[in-house]
Amino acid sequence: MSGTTAIVAFFKGNQVTVANVGDSRAIVGERKGKRIIAYSLSIDQTPYRADERERVKAAGAVVMSCDQLEGIVPFHENWGVNLGEELDNGGDPPRVWAPGKSFPGCAFTRSIGDHVAEG
């Protein structure tokens, strides 16, 4: 599976509208005294999210990490991480695989221009 992810932010006056596909992320910072607080403006579309995992599995995809696919670690779906924590989750994220294929698993559940899925 392949493709790309994207995000766009549209500013009009004091309003912002954000749209995203995949794991592209938008954040905004707010200065509070000497600190800057980051707020997420988008929600990643990845297999870390149970709703996205179930959606792609219902469409016939397989969701597992590379190590799970290769039998190095046992299969599990315990991907319960909060936004941002997945970056520190050991470097082997859950991926979406085409049924019966061992290539190329992608770490996002929605994309633009997925040639393998179109094929």
Regions found by a protein language model. Give the residues of each.
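PP2C/PPM-type serine/threonine phosphatase catalytic core
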Residues: M1-G119
